[in-house]
Amino acid sequence: MTKKQLLGLIIALFGISMFLQIIGIGDLLFWPLFFLIAGYFLKKYSRDWLGSVMYIFAAFLFLKNLFSITFNLFGYAFAAFLIYAGYRLIKGKPIFEPNEKQVNLNKKEHHEPPKDVKHPDMRSFFIGELQMMKQPFDLNDLNVSGFIGDIKIDLSKAMIPEGESTIVISGVIGNVDIYVPSDLEVAVSSAVFIGDINLIGSKKSGLSTKVYAASTDFSESKRRVKVSVSLFIGDVDVKYV
């Protein structure tokens, strides 16, 4: 979806909302539509589980407005999360792991798994923060997802192996700050629905913003890090130290 299409969609939604307000049923649809759109962008740019929770939350809000159910924001959000978590567990999948394409195991049952397969460090939180700033840490592929909260990572503290390491961060509301040592080659891509992005000097702000930036010798470097950040509301700041 282009920015012009997105802007047109938002204007149309506000127009529909005003019309529904005039005829007396505006509150029935505005917030459900808002969270429905939020779910769409989260599933497009981020993890499926966050988008799915938003879809369920939008359905709860619609039913609440339709049947005048007592509103409890935390209760609805937590119930939406539990429904999705239960669905994932019933399907035999981890709660926070993104859906992956199924592999035909029959064709590979006689083959041993590759010995050089990386096992990413998976971290997630509902409300809180993640800081990797003070203590040294080994950087295998890192995958972080959160609902509400800030994330701060200092790569000068990281023990980075040769080759390409990846960091994938996704969230709904919060800020992401990543500090990069001057001798490390990085490539960073970020998508934010509402907020500011500053990627090693490339800045952009506004609505449905995307930025990509890479250091000059990234592709030739023996030790490099690729970073991907997706947020619904928040700021992303990746800078050299």
From Swiss-Prot:
Designated name of the protein: Protein LiaF
Pfam annotation, one family: LiaF-TM
GO cellular component: plasma membrane
Regions crossing the membrane: 6-26, 49-63, 66-86
Compartmental location: Cell membrane
Topological relation to the membrane, as annotated: Multi-pass membrane protein
Annotated organism of origin: Bacillus subtilis (strain 168)
Disruption phenotype: Up-regulates expression of liaI which in turn induces the liaRS two-component regulatory system.
Keywords: Cell membrane, Membrane, Transmembrane, Transmembrane helix
InterPro entries noted in UniProt: Cell_wall_LiaF, LiaF-like_C, LiaF_C, LiaF_TM
Record NCBIfam families: LiaF_C_term
Stimuli inducing this protein: Induced, via the two-component regulatory system LiaS/LiaR, by antibiotics (vancomycin, bacitracin, nisin and ramoplanin), cationic antimicrobial peptides (human LL-37 and porcine PG-1), Triton X-100 and severe secretion stress.
